Every structure is written in C-alpha cells, then in structure tokens.
Amino acid sequence: LGTIDKIELLQESFFLSQFGRCDISQQLDLLSEAGHETNQAIIGKVAGLTAGLDRLVNLNSDEQAALRQFVSGLFKSQFTRIFQGHTDDINDTKARPIILSRLVYARDEQAIAYCDDLYQQHVADISQIDSNLRSVVLSAEVRLARPGVFDQLWELYLSVQDVELRLDICSALTATTDLSQADKLLTGSTVTTLIRPQDNYYFISGLMANRYTRSTAWHWIRHNWSWIEEVFGGDMNYDSYVQVAGRHLSTDDQLVEYDNFFRGINAPALSRTIKLGHNDIVRRLRWIKRNQPILANFLRQRL
C-alpha cells in the first residue's frame, strides 16, 4: 500500500471506532505494523492514535506502563535512525518532534537524556533550542519535574515578547503534573497586569488536555465563570471554555458536573456549544467503556 492508502486505513479505523461502528481491534493491528514506517505523515498519524489510547488506561497503572512500552516499540527504531544518525532529509526533520514527544511519553531513557542535554546546553537562552524541538524539550523538563525549570519558565513567560517562544513556554508549563503549579498558572493568568486576558484560555486548554491537571482546570472553570463572563462575554473566545470542557472531560462524574453546571448558565449564545459538548463527552465515554477491556487484553497478550 502507498502512503495515502495507509493513512486512510488508519484514519478510517479511528473514525469507525469513535462512532461505535467497530472497536479498536483493527486500529491496534494496524498500529502494530507501523513501527517500520519512515514517512512523516504516517508517523504523525500513528502518534496521534497512540496518544488517544492513553484515555483507555488509568494514570500510573500497569496498563499505562504496558502502553508506554508498546509506544516505545513503535518509535524507538526511528529515534535511533534520525537522532543518532545524520540526516538532513526534510521528511525526517518534520518527524523529529513527533518521535521525540512519543518517546518522552514512553519514558524512554535515551529520549529523555536527549531532552535533558539539549535543555542544559541552552539553559541561559532557551530561544536557541531548535524551534522544531523546543516545545517537546521544555515540556519534558516540566513534566519530569526537573528542579527549578517550572519557575524559570514562568518568569520568562512573563517577560518574553516573542510569540512563538511564549506559546512553547505555555505548552511546557501546562505539562506539569504538580497541582500547586497548575494553581499558580490559573491564578497568575487572571492578573491582567501580568498577562493578557486571552492567554488564560491557552493555560486552561493545556491544563485540560493534561490528565494530571484536568480536574483542577475544570474546577477552576466552574468556580471562576463570573470572571470568564466579565472578560469574554460577547467575545469570540466566550464559548471556547465550553468547547475545551466538551473536548476533554472523560468520566461519568465529569459528565454529570458538566450538565449540572451549564444547566445553570443563562447564556443563549452558548446553548448550541453546550449541547455539542455534552454529545462529545457522551460519545467519548461510550468509546472508553467499549474499548478499555480490548486494549487491556491486547497489552496483556503482546507484552
């Protein structure tokens, strides 16, 4: 099969499982055969699908450890080829951040050491880190709780003017697993003398995407809705907070909280977005419940 055909197969298996037409068995079989692929577009699709599988395992569980091992097996040979070899191929250049990010997730020692070394080389001026890898490297340093990195990046975020660098720092800061650090971001991002109000959404979005901090961010949204209304009411960003909740909430309790909270919000302009968010959460819950045992069995048999 050609590259386009392989991508279409992966995409089709994803959509069919998402909408309940089949389970993830075919997707897992396709992923299992993808470790040798070198095309950046296929690597990117495999990365996205394996990232989605993390929803099906509990944090810090044996199943998550097994999933990380599976992910490592898919990307390790590409890391060896691209990072330890010498290649200027544009396809490989585009694949580098994808591969590095997935191996950091997998807790691969060589990938983590690569991030540590690159960060230390440029600790005095992180803008000099390769821009294609910078977000991955900084996020790895924060996620792995390297001493002093979070505070350094937060102070830099408050002073730096470069938009691309600010976004990379924001992405890194929201990779934290420390709830006190998440609270610091949420509190600090409402101080308009320090940060533009619209930047608050970037922090919320990142913290909601992060499974370790999602509950903290969701709690903040519900308990600071008056601030959101005051700052963004009538603005195009207003419904973004509803969208990000619908995009990431993933438990039965969170669905109940979502429905109860937005039922009490009198905002006709948000009604359609609220309904779409509810439907997204319901569909996600069905997908999780249908496929959790399938992934668990796959990992037991394979690993």
Q: What are these regions, as identified by a protein language model?
A:
Residues 1-303:
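Long, ordered, helix-rich scaffold segments
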